[in-house]
A protein has these predicted regions:
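A conserved mid-protein helix/loop that constitutes part of the nucleotide-sugar donor-binding site
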Residues: 16-24, 199-222, 239-245
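N-terminal strand-loop element at the rim of the active site
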Residues: 8-69, 74, 241
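Short His-centered aromatic/hydrophobic patch
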Residues: 88-95, 114
Length: 328
């Protein structure tokens, strides 16, 4: 029996929640599927995770960087490659070029997977154009999809509108055995990071506006002013790292905040922490909140995190509008 070929689109070069979910699904699929993953040109921070023999990586110009080059490269690629399924992992439907090229060069069934409740705003005219394209493609191209999925009800409404009843809600899942609490791992993690008896707060995710780490630093600063025996671990990479590091310096928090960058041992770091902060402006579901609850970690999340993320009494919601003082 020939292997089924699946084209995967929508992953970035920075390992985040979407990348984690997609790779987790791929690694659990039977070996009679072959996956071709399209990634933006440039260095991929998680290339070591593509160890499976049934995964092929194709680099392509990102649509947001140059739509014309993207159209040319994607068209040329699909002219010479045939797939059994196309799996689109999207934060919006604004990539009209993608839908046009797929319509012209591919007959494979399309699966659209919504991972968020809004696109990441950059300000100005670009945001307006993305929103207009999103709603245009919602009306014109959704009918071409064979299957519509979302990680939460809110993510479904954002991507597909509120009038459809054919959407599959697939809550982000984790390997519970991997994230279960272990006292030995907690002691080891705290020893390796020289945390001692400090109360440890944790931030995890791509360092970007939507994750709202700057607000978390304001919260941590107020906590530190009340109790000096605290430390903040910031896990992840992104465009705002330098800005956040500078803010720590201005707030005189450099000795109390550790930027750990991209890590493969998220489960290990969760063991060493006491509180997870999730101050995101919006989330599709928040994979890390599920992982943290499994590890027995207290979680404080913004009202941008869907209610579906609450699996235990360890997760508590606070509105961002209440401000840093209330959070602290």
């Amino acid at each position: 029996m020939s292997k089924k070929r699946i084209l995967v689109y929508g992953l970035s070069n920075i390992f985040g929640g979407v990348e984690s979910i997609v790779l987790s699904i791929i690694n659990r699929m039977p070996d009679y599927y072959n996956f071709t993953i399209i990634l933006p040109k440039g260095e991929c921070s998680y290339s070591d995770k593509f160890h499976s023999s049934n995964i092929c990586i194709v680099s392509m110009t990102a649509w947001g960087k140059n739509p014309f080059n993207f159209r040319k490269e994607m068209s040329e690629f699909l002219k010479h490659e045939n797939f059994d399924y196309v799996w689109l992992n999207l934060s919006s439907l604004s990539n009209i070029t993608l839908f046009k090229v797929l319509h012209k060069y591919s007959t494979a069934p399309i699966v659209i997977h919504s991972h968020t409740v809004a696109f990441e705003k950059q300000g100005g005219l670009k945001d307006f154009l993305i929103l207009m394209l999103h709603y245009y493609c919602q009306k014109k191209y959704l009918k071409a999809a064979s299957c519509l999925c979302a990680c939460s009800k809110q993510a479904a409404i954002w991507m597909y509108g509120d009038k459809r009843n054919d959407i599959k809600i697939i809550n982000n899942g984790i390997d519970a055995d991997k994230f279960g609490y272990a006292d030995a791992d907690r002691m080891k993690c705290r020893a390796e990071l020289n945390l001692g008896s400090k109360i440890v707060f944790l931030l995890m995710g791509r360092l970007c506006e939507v994750k709202n780490q700057s607000f978390a630093l304001d919260v941590f600063n107020k906590i530190h002013n009340k109790c000096s025996n605290v430390h903040l671990l910031v896990v992840g990479e992104g465009d705002l790292r330098s800005e956040l590091e500078y803010k720590c310096k201005v707030l005189s928090l450099s000795d109390n905040v550790s930027f750990l960058g991209f890590r493969n041992d998220v489960n290990f770091l969760l063991q060493g922490a006491d509180v997870l902060l999730i101050p995101s402006l919006h989330e599709g579901l928040s994979l890390v909140s599920i992982e943290a609850q499994c590890a027995g970690l207290l979680c404080i999340a913004s009202d941008g995190v869907p209610e579906e993320a609450k699996k235990t009494e360890l997760l508590h919601f606070l509105p961002l509008q209440s401000g840093a003082d209330s959070w602290a």
